[in-house]
Regions:
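Solvent-exposed loop/turn and edge beta-strand elements of beta-rich ligand-binding domains
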Residues: 3, 28-36, 42, 177-184, ...
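Cross-family detector of peptidyl-prolyl cis-trans isomerase
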Residues: 23, 31-37, 169, 181-182, ...
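Peptidyl-prolyl cis-trans isomerase
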Residues: 178-227, 264
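Alpha-helical transmembrane segments
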Residues: 8-15
Length: 310
């Protein structure tokens, strides 16, 4: 009888140990790299798709493996950015992430993988990279990707005597457009500058200009402007002025040169342009590595994580 009880007790202990060990397992393992429930949950919260979340884990494992192979680690600058982004995300969404089982450290871990890709980009193609992308190529791509301009903006909406927003009449719109068109011609002829045109326009509406216009930059897809705005500005020669209507606004603008070293625009956007040019090459390296890594999925733990976000 005692032997039967002892065997039963041993069985309970074994089952208990197995359950405890399982609950402390990993939902996704890729090669030698294991991803916690919190890390998987954070990936899932971003992708909203379990297959894409697993794909991210594969990329992250490949990122770490490639960094190990090359003997590099995350730079102090990227570590600082990771810490700042983690603090920002946690300050806004801590409650949500705690509810789905994500800790602040989980976010740090995932962001560290993300910036690991940028570290690899710098290692291969950056300023001191193995296959550095020339400054000439960076400048050319920047000039193709962005346009700079100085603009005088006026609205087709005004306040009525009742304090309500109303659209300008057709005659008012025509008068405004003709005024801008006339000044654009004067700019293109060299009679006045865009800043002088700005002074003339503001004086006509009772305002005083105290400083020169700043150069604004935009690219395709910029949500601040209509879809066609970028292409309309890009068609202009540098230094050319034109009138562009966009939504409820009308612009008298002049395209600017933005690749001069003294302005610093190319340097400011260098990382973004390098990523546009070469991140796909880094991703290809990672895909080649991840294709040869064994992926193990704990369906039970994955399901637990997924149900919390359902």
């Amino acid at each position: 009888m005692k032997r039967i009880i002892s065997l039963a007790l041993i069985a309970v202990i074994i089952v208990g140990c197995f359950t405890a060990c399982s609950s402390q397992g990993y939902p996704v393992a890729v090669g030698d790299f294991k991803f916690s429930q919190g890390e998987y949950a954070y990936c899932l919260s971003i992708t909203k798709d379990k297959d894409e979340a697993v794909a991210r884990c594969k990329t992250y494992a490949a990122t770490k493996k490639l960094m190990n192979n090359e003997g590099i680690s995350l730079s102090a600058n990227y570590k600082r950015i990771v810490a700042e982004e983690t603090d920002s995300v946690w300050s806004l969404f801590a409650g949500y992430y705690e509810n789905i089982g994500v800790t602040k450290q989980d976010i740090t871990s995932v962001l560290t993988y993300e910036y690991g890709k940028k570290e690899l980009l710098d290692f291969y193609y950056g300023e001191n990279g193995k296959n550095k992308v020339s400054d000439k190529k960076i400048t050319k791509e920047f000039d193709n990707s962005y346009v700079g301009f100085k603009a005088i903006e006026a609205s087709y909406i005004k306040l009525s005597d009742m304090g309500e927003s109303v659209e300008l009449s057709d005659n008012e719109k025509k008068k405004l457009k003709n005024n801008f068109t006339s000044m654009a011609k004067r700019i293109n002829s060299g009679e006045i500058t865009i800043d002088e045109a700005n002074e003339i326009y503001n004086e006509s509406i009772g305002l005083i200009v105290t400083q020169s216009l700043d150069t604004a930059l935009t690219k395709q897809g910029d949500v601040l402007y209509a879809d066609t705005f970028f292409s309309q500005v890009q068609k202009l020669d540098k230094g050319e002025a034109a009138v562009i209507e966009s939504g409820n606004s009308i612009y008298l603008l002049q395209r600017q040169e933005i690749t001069n070293d003294e302005d610093g625009y190319v340097f400011m956007y260098k990382s973004e342009i390098l990523e546009k040019l070469k991140m796909s090459a880094v991703q290809k390296k990672l895909d080649n590595i991840s294709a040869n890594l064994e992926v193990k999925i704990n369906k039970g733990l994955c399901k637990d994580t997924e149900e919390k976000q359902a």
